[in-house]
Structure formats: structure tokens, C-alpha cells
Amino acid sequence: MQMQNSQIQGLGHADLVQAPDDSWWMICLGYRTSGYLQHVMGRETMLAPVEWAKGGWPVVNGNGTLETDMPCNTLPLVPMAQDPEREEFDFIKRNAHADSYHALGLPMGWMSLCNPDYSNYSLTERKGFLRLRPSTTDLSETASPTFVARRQTELNFSATALLDLSQLIEGMQAGITAYAAPLNHYDVVVECRNGKLFAKSVVRLGQTSHSEKELPLSGNKAYLRITSDKDFYYMQASSDGTHFTTLAKMEYRFLSTETIGGFTGVMLGLFTQSEVQTDGYVDVDWFEYRTTIQP
């Protein structure tokens, strides 16, 4: 009963491990909740200190509970490679191989949906850019749209992308999304109509799709952003990267496991789609993901 109001929930699949210094630890799965005791980040691997006296029972964290912060003696720290905050889509800088999707030069944390059509993705046609060609499959179908994304890892974050839309033609859409499932995602979408670009919010909840506000864009570039403050996702757009307009805000709980099921959590990514086959495309200059860890 001590855990019922804890931010950490859904614990299971635990293993007890003894470290080289004879200290004991528990590795398990669990998820972090927020205001509504719901979670959007899927099940994560967690580590907790264990006291195990000879002849006694193991006790986790002194009282049998897990917290986001648990004071304890730690093992020697080992530096780990970190993904850059800003992905600039230059596989040459990383000496990565570009023959297959998983080695496009993106960190291994990037992913697509189902079996991607590799011809819709390129890092070589324009150096330093990720070129996305639209699919006639859209985000709300159970198939493989043109889509690349990474996991949401904190409740407080900002995800921003700079898109070159000079080859976005009418009938196409491109954007950034907080994606939980085909019928549950929050998007910032750019469309071209009569030669002009417009950004809008699209909220997909089950069989309902809703757009609240539209923003005319100047020029052929757009800065698209989704942020979260633990309770809401905010969908934003800008022509200059400095002055952002909030197009909509939606509660994060509508993308949570408790609302829609599943256990893998929200992805933050880029997509393009079209009503018909087209020669248009979108070039992504960079994608930036910044997080703030808060208690």
C-alpha cells in the first residue's frame, strides 16, 4: 500500500544483482506517472539499492518502495555516450554507413513504423539534411507512413524541427508529432494551398480528428515544435525560430497507457504524407530534443 501514491508504478520482472563491491541491487521494470497517475513514457528499466543481511530477507530502498531519487552509495560511474540534443542528420560526421535504414547515421534510438519504404528516406541526396518523401499511408493507418521518431524520455521536454518546405506541393502534409498509436497522436502539420504555406494543429483521438488554429507562414521554411509541462502537450509553429505561436494544447493523459492501452509510450517524430503519389518532398535541417528533469 505504500506505493499507491508514488510516482513510480507498474513494477515487475525484478532481478537481484550483487555488484563487485558486494552491494546488492534490484533491476526491474516500471513507469513514471504524473498528475493523473497516468503515464505516457512506457515501461522503463529501473535500478534500486537493496539491503540484504545474512540470514534475512532483501529490503529494497530501506522501506520496500522505489522513488525517482534514492540516496545510496553508488558504484563507480562509467561515462556513456549520449545522443546529441540536436540531430543534424549528417551521417558522414559519425562515420556511419548509409546503406540501410538503421544505419542512416541516426542514433539507434530513432525508429519507424512497421516495415519502412527505404526509398522515402535519404541522407545523401542533400548533405546535412534528412529528405522525406511522402507516402500515401498517413499516420492514422496501421501501416508504414513516412515517419522517423525517437522516444519521449521525460515529462518536461521541447522537441523542435526546422523544415525546408520549398518542395512541399499541394496535397502534401509534413510535420512533427507526439505519436502514441495510429488513432492517438498530436501533430503540427504544414500544408501548401495556392502557393502559400500554413501550419495547423491536428489532434487525433480515436475516430475524431480536430484542428483548432491555423498560422500563415512566410518563406519556405518552418520551425515546428511540441513541448510538454507534465500536464499538457503544446503544439507550436514559427517562421523565424524566435516567435512561436501556440496552435493548440491538449492533456497528456489522452495519450497515456491508461487511456489507450499499450506499454511502449509516446514517440516524438517527423512525418510527411500525401493524398496521391507525388514527386514532392521535405528536407529536415535538424531535430532538437531538450529535456528538463524535475521532481
Regions found by a protein language model. Name each.
Residues 1-295:
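Carbohydrate-active catalytic/glycan-binding domains of CAZyme proteins
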